[in-house]
């Protein structure tokens, strides 16, 4: 009985190892990184005109005990025309809004392009390396690790009217193995001065294929932004829904 269990466990482990592809060779890894860089730098130009909904939830945990309270929920319509964003506020905390005044401090879809620039812009001088294979929302992905020094970074953290700081960053990028498209970036701030009020800042941005008109495009899917000030934790969730061509009816309201 014990022997059969051991053999079964061994066969299962062998099956997992066989299912996991070997790491790409050095030349292939360099090409994966080069192709991901090209995709990142072309991201804005590859976006079509579209309309979608952006939903933002801002949450706080004053004591850092994982007891979150949603401070507000903002539902907006986002229109992208000729690479220019236009927001119309639909509701705030479930109450219909006039649509004219956008609440301050909200993420913009263009920030998804900024995150890619922070890593792949040549001025960032990022150290990028292939890390491992992984799976993400049904895609087999390459996971790349990266690091950008503060002197080359575009990640600026501000607090109130005080002097902002430019932080270094490190993290991971998930790249679709079939298309080379970037599907997720995870960014963590480093080298923040000990005297600065915000001592923790991290971003996770997800991208996905969406059908807009007759074609599929890589567009923002969701983002989570985290920060820490003393015991206070702040978590902003952003989701995108109902992508369509301008002038087309939404599939869900």
Please tell me what each predicted stretch does.
Residues 10-20:
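Hydrophobic h-region of N-terminal signal peptides that target proteins for export
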Residues 20-169, 177-184, 188-253:
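Structured extracytoplasmic
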Residues 1-10:
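Bacterial N-terminal signal peptides that target proteins for export
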């Amino acid at each position: 009985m014990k022997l059969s269990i051991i053999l079964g466990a061994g066969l299962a482990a062998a099956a997992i190892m066989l299912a996991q592809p070997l790491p790409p060779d050095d030349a292939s890894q360099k090409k994966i990184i080069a192709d991901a860089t090209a995709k990142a730098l072309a991201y804005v130009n590859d976006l079509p005109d579209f309309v979608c909904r952006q939903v933002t939830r801002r949450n706080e945990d004053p004591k850092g005990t994982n007891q979150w309270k949603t401070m507000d929920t903002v539902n907006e319509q986002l229109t992208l025309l000729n690479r220019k964003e236009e927001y119309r506020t639909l509701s705030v905390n479930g109450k219909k809004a006039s649509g004219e005044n956008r609440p301050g401090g909200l993420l913009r879809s263009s920030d998804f392009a900024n995150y890619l620039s922070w890593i792949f812009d040549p001025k960032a001088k990022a150290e990028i390396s292939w890390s491992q294979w992984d799976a993400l929302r049904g895609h087999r992905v390459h996971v790349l690790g990266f690091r950008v020094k503060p002197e080359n970074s575009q990640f600026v953290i501000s607090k109130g009217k005080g002097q902002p700081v430019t932080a270094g960053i490190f993290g991971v990028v998930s790249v679709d193995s079939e298309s080379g498209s970037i599907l997720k970036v995870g960014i963590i701030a480093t080298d923040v001065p000990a005297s600065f009020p915000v001592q923790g800042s991290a971003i996770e941005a997800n991208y996905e294929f969406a059908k807009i008109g007759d074609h599929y495009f890589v567009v923002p899917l969701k983002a989570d932004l985290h920060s820490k000030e003393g015991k206070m934790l702040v978590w902003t969730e952003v989701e995108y829904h109902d992508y369509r061509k301008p002038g087309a009816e939404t599939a869900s309201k």
